[in-house]
Structure formats: structure tokens, C-alpha cells
Amino acid sequence: PNLELHDLMRQFTRQIVQGKSKDFDASQIILVCGAERSGKTLLSKKLAKFLPTHTAAQNSTLILQNNRVIADPLSGDLNSLFKSSSDANVTSLFRKRQDIALDGSRLIVDYEGPMDLLNSVLMRLETLEHKPQVSVIYTLEVGKSYDAVRQALEVLQIPNLSVALTKMDLLEVSISELSAVFDLGTKIQFFSGLKTLEDGLDFAKISVVEDFLLDIVRQDGL
């Protein structure tokens, strides 16, 4: 392709690929949300298995904590779960769950609640005195139209939300889908489905998306 077209593709790619994020790296809680059967449960497991864990000090020894996964709607009696008093902390949110302890591990939430309640969940997390660093990942199954992708992402309206493209072992992402992500100013952070859970987690890379676009350009003879 000519240099001008190559530069345009590079600019386009840089707008839609998240790249390394210090905020995400520091996250204590990662909420994974998405449509039913969009691959969010598998992605939650991948994140827990392959993301680095924080370390916790115990008797002057650094203990590596395993990341935890819970599947939870975070709904019901939310007012009793979220505390704003001086003793508020992340563990009070899940105090009925014996398997939860944020003592160095990350908590990956496979979010099972309605999407229209997710903003409420995030707002209440912000009211905790010991504010946890929270990231939100939306699992977007590839193989959809421009309008379907735009509609799915538009209704969320969650700041700093990033996307994981899922089921990429079954279908190839289209330029229409990438264009919808671009038009909404959303960033892609993960590719899921290119490898099995045992093989690893794919962070979205600018070079990978550029190569994909270049292949399409070559096929079209541009």
C-alpha cells in the first residue's frame, strides 16, 4: 500500500488499541461484563490465571497471592453491602463470601447483573473510603455488524471502559466492527479465542491490528 494509506491505518489503529495502561495494571477489581454467551466467563478465568498478581507482605515475607474469580450479579440488597463509614473497605462488599480477600490478589468479577445496574455498582464502589482501583472490560463477540457493535457499546456509557474481542477462533473481526469501536472512542484491550486458556491471554497489540488491515488492503489490491 502507499505510504499515505499506511499512515492512515496506523493512526486508526492507535486510536482503537489500548496499549499498556498503568491504571489497569494497578487494578484491584476487574469487572468483566458482556452479553450472554459472549465469552466473558472464559475471559474472566484467563485474566485470573495470566494477569500478574500483587504481592502481600506477611511476617516480612512477600507472599504471592492468587487472583480470584467470582460470578456475581452484585445486585439485591446493595445498600447493605456498600459501606461509606470509616471502616469501609473492599472486603465489606463481599463480606458474605468466604472466598474473597483482597490481600494482594486481584478480584475478577464475572458480572452477572443487568447492564443498566453496572453504573450504580461502579458509583457505589467509588464511595468506599478505601477506594479500590477498578477496571471494566466489555466482552464483544466478533462477527457482528457495525450497527450491532455501536448499539452494544453506546448503551454502556461507562468511562474508561475497554473491550475484549472474543471468539476470534470462530470468526474474523471485520473493518465494520473496528470502525464502530473507533467512532465511539472505545479502546480494544484484549483478543480472546486466538489461544486456549492454557496457552495464555492475548493483549491487543497495534502491530497485530495493523497487519490485519494491511492484509485486507492487499486482498483488495489497494
Regions found by a protein language model. Name each.
Residues 1-27:
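Extreme N-terminal, non-catalytic leader segments
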Residues 33-38, 63-124, 128-130, 138-142:
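Switch II (G3) loop of P-loop NTPases
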Residues 49-63, 69-70:
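Post-Walker A helix-loop "phosphate-sensing" segment adjacent to the P-loop in P-loop NTPases
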